Curated annotation (Swiss-Prot):
InterPro entries: DUF4667. Signal peptide: none annotated. The keyword ATP-binding does not apply. This is Uncharacterized protein YNR014W. GO terms for cellular component: cytoplasm. Residues 167-179 have a biased composition (Polar residues).
Length: 212
């Protein structure tokens, strides 16, 4: 099998993401303060973002504007094979979910909205022998018949040093191989978790002005 026969997978393609800053003029704060406070107290299903600062805006916009809301937009990776199932379940945006109708065209999978990954993609492989056994299992040693006598040292420190002398030569420091602690027979060690993770590539942020 050549390298051209291998089809790209959605796992290995970086996910494109960018942050959208929704800003508003500071002069419009007094006019919209009464309407925003009434909407926050009357409806609980709608999003009401607090007024922020100008941190995050470019110098040309940070003088007379303030950030109202920040939205993280994540687009699903484009897979070469259309028949291959994508890792992304559905497109989702927190702001649009609260303010828009679920059946609106803006929430369809074809739009560039946030994508939710299934929880199984974040699971790590764990081996049963890495877990400590329960006290009720018979493999554990029994602590019922303990000796009441204290442990005594039968060899002095001087005799012990003569029997097992400490070498003055330093042990050669060898670099640890990545396959030292891997078992090829285990199916969990045939892949790397980081290689199966989803990489996010952040593009330049976008700035949208909210009109009153």
């Amino acid at each position: 099998m050549s390298s051209t026969d291998i089809k790209p997978c959605a796992v290995n393609i970086p996910v494109s993401a960018h942050i959208t800053f929704h800003y508003k003029s500071i002069a419009d704060r007094s006019s919209s303060r009464s309407s925003s406070s009434s909407s926050c107290s009357s409806a609980t299903s709608k999003a009401c973002s607090p007024r922020g600062s100008s941190v995050g805006l470019p110098p040309a916009l940070s003088t007379d504007n303030e950030i109202v809301e920040t939205v993280l937009n994540v687009s699903a990776p484009v897979v070469a094979d259309p028949t291959r199932p994508s890792l992304f379940k559905s497109n989702y945006t927190a702001a649009s979910c609260l303010t828009s109708d679920p059946t609106s065209p803006s929430l369809l999978p074809s739009s560039r909205r946030n994508s939710v990954l299934p929880a199984s993609d974040f699971h790590q492989c764990a081996h049963h022998k890495n877990f400590q056994r329960r006290a009720s299992e018979p493999q554990l040693p029994s602590f019922d018949n303990r000796s009441s006598s204290e442990m005594k040292r039968s060899v002095s420190y001087a005799q012990h040093s003569m029997m097992f002398p400490i070498s003055d030569q330093q042990e050669p420091q060898t670099s640890a191989s990545p396959n030292d602690h891997s078992d090829p027979s285990c199916p969990c060690n045939r892949h790397h978790h980081r290689r199966n993770s989803v990489a996010v590539k952040f593009d330049k942020p976008l700035y949208e002005r909210l009109e009153t």
